[in-house]
């Protein structure tokens, strides 16, 4: 199993992304992922990756106007041009930094509107934008990822909130370089049944993220999920991608990484599986 440090969440004690890349390297990671790197000087970000021999394995499309309540634009009607501009920016960053996976953020139901009245239009917009994105990403040799985000705790207005909905969209778009981003935190909240859902949707999964339920902390913190079992299940199914550590450290990030050290020590073989 290979783990990547989500530097938008881990190492909050370090003030900037280049510093967090260094901290992740010193903590045993060989890869990082990030939500939105766009406010950081790209030259400094790239230099940190190169200096510490780190891979960037995932970034997100720009969120739009966060202050106006936006969290992605791919499914928001009337914002197609802005989505495409943001996608081009994400592809530019990813190409320059050697990243081959981009999370295409669907976005929220627009303020003042009810889901039931706009859901059909949002799905049509999402499919249109995903078809466009798949072509652009395909030309760059990249994979686009769809992540369901739970609507019960985290994002009540987010358009895409269950693996079933995401899988349905993927089947309608029918593009091989579009995959499912499985965040086990969100999947557990939106129905659980993880063993069966992981097996059912495994052929679609292109990236995995983790956090414990209910407080979104380290995998070995008190909560609902047995991550040692889940890691073994993924490995048994043949998962070869990265597992992104997208959780809120309870305290010092490094002190909270004992779960990873324990798991890797228990793995068979001598290979460093963080690589």
From Swiss-Prot:
Its EC number is 5.3.1.22. The keyword Isomerase applies. It catalyses: 3-hydroxypyruvate = 2-hydroxy-3-oxopropanoate. The active site is at residues 147, 246. It comes from the Eukaryota. Keywords: Isomerase. GO terms for molecular function: hydroxypyruvate isomerase activity. GO terms for biological process: glyoxylate metabolic process. The keyword Isomerase applies. It holds the Pfam family AP_endonuc_2. Belongs to the hyi family. Catalyzes the reversible isomerization between hydroxypyruvate and 2-hydroxy-3-oxopropanoate (also termed tartronate semialdehyde). PANTHER family: HYDROXYPYRUVATE ISOMERASE-RELATED (PTHR43489:SF6), ISOMERASE (PTHR43489). This is Putative hydroxypyruvate isomerase. It comes from Xenopus laevis (African clawed frog). The gene is hyi.
